[in-house]
Amino acid sequence: LGDVPGTSGAIFVARPESNYPDRFGLFGAPPLEEGYVILVGDGRLKRFPPPSEFLLSVWSRSRAARPVCCSIVLCCFCLTVFLYLSENMGQTATTPLSLTLDHWKDVERTAHNQSVEVRKRRWVTFCSAEWPTFNVGWPRDGTFNPDIITQVKIKVFSPGPHGHPDQVPYIVTWEALAVDPPPWVKPFVHPKPPLLLPPSAPSLPPEPPLSTPPQSSLYPALTSPLNTKPRPQVLPDSGGPLIDLLTEDPPPYRDPGPPSPDGKGDSGEVAPTEGAPDSSPMVSRLRGRREPPVADSTTSQAFPLRLGGNGQFQYWPFSSSDLYNWKNNNPSFSEDPGKLTALIESVLLTHQPTWDDCQQLLGTLLTGEEKQRVLLEARKAVRGEDGRPTQLPNDINDAFPLERPDWDYNTQRGRNHLVHYRQLLLAGLQNAGRSPTNLAKVKGITQGPNESPSAFLERLKEAYRRYTPYDPEDPGQETNVSMSFIWQSAPDIGRKLERLEDLKNKTLGDLVREAEKIFNKRETPEEREERVRRETEEKEERRRAEDERREKERDRRRHREMSKLLATVVSGQRQDRQGGERRRPQLDHDQCAYCKEKGHWARDCPKKPRGPRGPRPQASLLTLDD
């Protein structure tokens, strides 16, 4: 070792380990070798601190090292948390409820298409806490099974205290997601099992049903046949039970007859076999909407009564979502009876509802008191054989019964009863919607600033129908309506209509046309703003010119007064000078100042009186006290 550079003069001493009890190895561990050799130094062994003591000393001595140490510790902590969360999230199972929460924007869009609004917190509460208590098989994590959704929907739409109106938007939205699933729902939707039919339907026994028909709470519904070319019609068994959608007994409507023995229907297709009925009338109705339309005698599948392929009427109940939308998108009967009457009239004419459907429609859209008033007015409208309103209870109960009648809609007599019942119901709605006469309400209808005359006239006529017993379309009331139209129009239109020539011979249509011309010639808001600005500028200019004119007139008057004053002063001074000169005329050197004669002076004037001079009058001075 003496040849090693830099070690000349060093003392090399070999000492055993036992002589240095304070020697430590790495991290304070004892050394592994038996001994060691000190190459450089005085032979003393220095004790080096462990890494923990080194870090603490660096932390206390170096200020710059503190942020570095904190950053390292924070990075290690974040990395550990990230790895832990990634591992746990990867193990979380996806459920229908969590799927809807992850795609909440799509759920809100679906609810908006159904004309309803949903909230995320209530969505989670109903799905995980409320609907599992209905005992229909709803899991706490949700499901897209149409059968379970339909059962929950029936519970929600139950009438009376057992219903849940606040949950209607949520179950309707959930049903819409299952019926028309978005791409992220399709993997979770239960596929429909294919309907297997034997080649010869009459000779083989029917297939077992897929599920038992649930106990529902609306009205009975007979599933309609699905008439497509590849598959024959599937009608419910003629001996099977009807599905009850309310807690009441089913109406005595006749079941559809069995298929013809020859296996041919009216349209020449293969005779239907006894297939498995749908699990719910709502599911069958929605399924019928999703599939292609049937090529038979009818084109609508939404009517309660429609003609099936076998020549018999099929019953389709109202959709609960339709009833919900009708109720929430229209004013109440007390608020606007005309609008709700028009809605019910269109439903009665197009949907051809049965007696039970009419009761369901009235119970949904009207309150209890409104419904009783409508039924009372409808029974008053029943006419006897002489064509006048009758008071016979039997005739009234036959035409407009309050209990479920035995009317078969598959017979002409039953359909005639239903048509007459709908007409009486419509008359009751119209009579019950008439309010007591209140002309003040009619006078309170005025034309808005931007309302067209035609729209204003419609509102005015509606007020006449609602608050008066008069018909505004009656020619005898045209004069009253015309006067109201003129007086209650906008001020500019009313003034010009009052100045029309031959006003008394003008019809209401002529007045409306003139009002439309005046309305269309109105200036736009931009033109009105420009006109107001221009008028303001002109008014300001006129005011400024008037102020200048008044100032000039004031200056001119002041100048005139000053001129008069100066002229007066100058003339007074001139008069004073002229008066002084007259009092003291210039005398010659030999002229008498007393008699103005020449030849002597005033003291020698013979004309001057002689005698003692009287005392001079003393001038009195005024003091401040005087």
UniProtKB/Swiss-Prot annotation:
Residues 199-306, 522-626 are annotated as: Disordered. Coiled coil: none annotated. One of its GO terms (biological process) is virion assembly. Glycosylated by host. Cleaved by host near the middle of the molecule, releasing the c-terminal half containing capsid and nucleoprotein domains op GAG. Residues 522-554, 574-607 have a biased composition (Basic and acidic residues). GO terms for cellular component: host cell plasma membrane; membrane. It is found in: Host cell membrane. It is a single-pass membrane protein. The keyword Transmembrane applies. A zinc finger (CCHC-type) spans 590-607. One of its GO terms (molecular function) is nucleic acid binding. Glycans are attached at N113, N480. Keywords: Glycoprotein, Host cell membrane, Host membrane, Membrane, Metal-binding, Transmembrane, Transmembrane helix, Zinc, Zinc-finger. This is Glyco-Gag protein.
